[in-house]
Regions:
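Non-heme di-metal
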Residues: 1-73
């Protein structure tokens, strides 16, 4: 298991969360004047949240593997 990748994953999660928030704010900003643009930004926000969840789930799995190795499983 690559510890550098494991150590970097929380930063990746935070970056995805920040991107999701940025897109959501843009969606709210353009909701009234450009609803199609707002919809696109909200869709992009959802994609970033999905990316965040994928990374988070993988991180949890990798940490679980470390726990198993520690416990001799």
């Amino acid at each position: 298991m690559d510890h550098e990748t494991l150590d970097n994953m929380p930063k990746l999660i935070a970056a995805e969360a920040q991107d999701a928030m940025n897109y959501a704010h843009l969606a709210l900003e353009h909701r009234e004047d450009h609803p199609d643009l707002a919809d696109m930004f909200m869709e992009l926000s959802g994609e970033e949240l999905r990316h965040m969840k994928m990374i988070s789930d993988k991180l949890a799995s990798m940490v679980g593997e470390l726990h198993d190795r520690y416990n001799g499983v």
